[in-house]
């Protein structure tokens, strides 16, 4: 089960959405939160930035890329619908986690990304990286444990690109 909500940033009850996210997580539901940037349109260039965060160091052994399954699946669906392209950006905050080229190729194969998908690893925090890469029609994120509605709105406003934020149900797995 997946719940979809669109957040009007001009009139938002952040506490309501924060509680809804907590309830969704507690009940193992999925959730897709669309936050439009006020002056941006979708699907003009057909470019999608998929931001993968907190990928576990043992992802190949466990076949688990963390809380990134729903966001990755959604990016694949939007890409197919738009006939677009995906830039998958792996945020690496963990200095112990290395992503050699073979791992990047393995992710591309195991997720079944389209051939034109570009996958890169970016060091640092999510917001500073999102502000650097403003070449997309939409940014797609996973909702990390400490991410509030206010933080999501801030990411959209700072990037000046509409955002889709996904809460995993922990029931889907994008890897094959």
Feature map (PLM): residue ranges:
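Membrane-embedded alpha-helical bundles that form conduits across membranes
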Residues: 1-176
């Amino acid at each position: 089960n997946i719940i979809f909500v669109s957040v009007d940033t001009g009139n938002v009850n952040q506490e309501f959405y924060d509680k809804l996210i907590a309830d969704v997580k507690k009940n193992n539901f999925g959730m897709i939160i669309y936050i439009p940037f006020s002056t941006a349109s979708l699907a003009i260039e057909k470019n999608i930035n998929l931001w993968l965060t907190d990928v576990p160091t043992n992802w190949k052994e466990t076949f688990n890329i963390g809380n990134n399954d729903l966001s990755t699946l959604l990016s694949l669906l939007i890409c197919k619908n738009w006939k677009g392209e995906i830039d998958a950006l792996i945020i690496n905050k963990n200095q112990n986690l290395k992503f050699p080229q073979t791992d990047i190729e393995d992710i591309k194969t195991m997720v079944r990304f389209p051939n034109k998908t570009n996958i890169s690893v970016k060091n640092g925090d999510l917001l500073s990286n999102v502000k650097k890469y403003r070449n997309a029609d939409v940014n797609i994120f996973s909702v990390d444990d400490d991410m509030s509605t206010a933080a999501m709105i801030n990411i959209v406003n700072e990037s000046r690109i509409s955002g889709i934020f996904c809460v995993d149900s922990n029931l889907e797995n994008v890897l094959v």
